[in-house]
C-alpha cells in the first residue's frame, strides 16, 4: 500500500466490515450500482478511522455470504482483516464514469 495523491477529488464507494473467515478476506459494503462494479474502480484509497490513507491496488472482489468479499494484497490473516473494520474505500473521481 502506498500513500495516495491528495490533490485528487476522492469519492467514497464502500466500507470494509472486518474479516470473512481466517484467510484474510474482508467483508465489503459497496455503495456502487451495481454492487460488484466497485472492483473496476482501482486503485482504492483506504481511509481508516484516524483519517490515515493508503493506496491499495490489485483487490479482487467476489460474492459470498450475504454480500461482497474482498481479497487484498498484503492482508493474509483474520487479524489483519479485522484491523480494517470501518475503513472507508475511496477512489479518484476521475476513475468513475
Question: Where are the language model's segments positioned?
Answer:
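Short Lys/Arg-rich amphipathic alpha-helical segments
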Residues: 1-97
